[in-house]
């Protein structure tokens, strides 16, 4: 019987957890020396690498001194809250990874809180001690305070701390004495993290995660809670409504390195993947068909935000996408529901419109961005928060937001947040920076990030996470400027843009194709105006001498997907295609728009 340790890794964005796992895989001699591997083997989807965030949790395992260590990488961002809880269910302990300079960050707190409630035993790793002016001792104190505030037990507070640098590939129990390998970390894992309890009896396994392969369909992943599962055995699947469906396990796989290994049986305490089970949901229990005993289901965080998805019906429809019809989009959203748990989709019976519910703008924009790269064309409406009735009161989601800025900008930021119905909860100074915590309605966060960065000259570090539902806070002012709208379709000319510069700022480059009703810029005043950007210089006027030789154009504002979603108004869509992103009015024709506004 192999000895097993199941650990989850908890860390803030960019504190180096994926790099650390790479090094642990190296230490477990997973790769032959001649096999060159890329950096960041875990974040294997392009989007994750670009943003440096882990979206989906993944499992890998390493063998060390006859122990099998299952490592579960958790997403750090609370927009993927549904992922976090399930993942922690498979672990017996956790590695809390903290940056030696920044200390524990708010998003770490979110995952850590869940881990402590589940009673996992932590091992703290203070990473990046090779950086200049880091402060490992202070950070260790901060971690202790944080755990204390999260109501950790005495046993949890008595945690071991390992210092090191994942990038340079060393870990040590004392940060002033660097070593040349990460063995001390592996030893600490084996010494401090409890082994899984082995329970004899009828088999039980809670399905906590799933994988999808076009070859065998959906694959259930979970940790065997009790007994053992064998290939080809009959099992009962306990559903949400209490019914039990008899099924048979076709194949069993355990995790071995980055891949999987087919095995005949899996004993309790190990993590495995089952092939051949149909129609299961996350939270169902695999158990004995004759006297089923379901395990307690996991609650997955409710969505707090919704957006409208619809087919692209702009004049440039189908120019650069492969999948453009409503059937394609419907199928793609169905497929996403298989993997993405915190997502809900509701179809409008009359039109090709879907309302997609998710955990926040980040969660939904990751989905849109993924679809865009796969060659889909679609349009998305303004993000709306989900309002609930609680005890007859209208309630809205409120988030805990932390902003870290240099001292001189703090008053500006406080002013900006309180205008959006946020309230300052705490404030403390570290050197010349100030860390502030606010409670702010989710509505107020939409579109806030760009403003905060502008006001603080790009210095602010901002992160937020869902807190709870609170009574409705009243109206919030959104962007007050109107839009500049293209009058007719065609190519935008520098000559026309130059003449219109004093009207506002533009979002388009000269020589770009535009269509009537497209939002091409932001008006300096608060009303929408229709401008003609397709006007070129008349031929007869070419030789007239004058000061109009050069058009001097201020460079246009370029939006990322999230910024565009946060920027648009309720009567606008973002049109997303594989090569372009445009903003447009929902009603393209000017006369019809005026009629609708009356």
Task: For every predicted segment, state its role.
Residues 1-98, 102, 142, 210-213:
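P-loop NTPase switch module centered on the Walker A-proximal segment
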Residues 15, 27, 31, 77-78, ...:
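Conserved nucleotide-binding/hydrolysis micro-motifs of P-loop NTPases
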Residues 30-57, 80, 146-159, 190-203, ...:
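Active-site phosphate-binding and catalytic loops of NTP-dependent enzymes
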Residues 94-156:
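Conserved C-terminal guanine-recognition region of P-loop GTPase G domains, centered on the G4
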Residues 148-282, 401-404, 465, 470-472, ...:
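Conserved catalytic-core segments of large NTP-driven translation/proteostasis enzymes
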Residues 225-351, 373, 555:
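Catalytic P-loop NTP-binding/switch module of NTPases
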Residues 255, 260-263, 440, 453-454, ...:
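Long insertion/accessory domains within large nucleic-acid-processing enzymes
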Residues 292, 300-432, 443-445:
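Charged, conformationally dynamic linker/hinge segments
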